[in-house]
Amino acid sequence: MEDLLNEVVPQEDLERFEKKYHHELELDGEVTTDTKFEYAFCLVRSRYTNDVRKGIMILEELARTHPDGRRDYIYYLAFGNARIKEYTSGLKYCRAFLDIESNDQVRSLEEYIKKEIDKEVAKGMVVAGGAALVLGGILGLGIAMARNKQKREK
């Protein structure tokens, strides 16, 4: 799954679908659902976080307004959120997808996200533990210095 998440869209594909998207927007003032999806699909696979976020926004709008393609939109919402390490959102979309249907690829993505969440929690605990040790050390040093000062004054 990690390989799939790290795979990026070729720049020429992204540019082609971006051009198509903007062409439709300029021509008709609207963009077809298919073009929006194609563009969002490329964006969530971009190497740039801002592109991925833009793709997520388009997919969220599609999921709200076009229930026919909801399954695909939800999958790529989970995928895009996982790519930018928004694991809570990614997990939410995985579960929403699995409510619609069972799918091994989505289950694999869900497991990957859960492992990443566990890693984040572990990192947080290490940082908190380290901070507590540093604080304890500083406090201990302060107490020792205060005692030493009291002994000298006697």
From Swiss-Prot:
Signal peptide interval: none
GO terms of molecular function: lipid binding; molecular adaptor activity
Gene null: resulting phenotype: RNAi-mediated knockdown results in elongated mitochondria.
Membrane topology listed for this record: Single-pass membrane protein
Annotated Gene Ontology cellular component terms: mitochondrial outer membrane; peroxisomal membrane
Domain of life where this protein originates: Eukaryota
TM region(s), chain numbering: 125-145
Spans within the Mitochondrial intermembrane topological domain: 146-154
Ranges of the Cytoplasmic topological domain: 1-124
Stored InterPro entries: Fis1, Fis1_cytosol, Fis1_TPR_C, Fis1_TPR_N, TPR-like_helical_dom_sf
Pfam families: Fis1_TPR_C, Fis1_TPR_N
GO biological process: mitochondrial fission; mitochondrion organization; peroxisome fission; positive regulation of mitochondrial fission
Locations listed in the record: Mitochondrion outer membrane
Keywords, ordered alphabetically: Membrane, Mitochondrion, Mitochondrion outer membrane, Transmembrane, Transmembrane helix
Metal-binding as UniProt keyword: no
PANTHER family, A to Z: MITOCHONDRIAL FISSION 1 PROTEIN, TETRATRICOPEPTIDE REPEAT PROTEIN 11 TPR REPEAT PROTEIN 11
Domain notes: The C-terminus is required for mitochondrial localization, while the N-terminus is necessary for mitochondrial fission.
Role: Involved in the fragmentation of the mitochondrial network and its perinuclear clustering. Functions downstream of Pink1 and upstream of Drp1 to regulate mitochondrial fission.
Family: Belongs to the FIS1 family.
Protein name (record): Mitochondrial fission 1 protein
Native organism: Drosophila melanogaster
Gene: Fis1
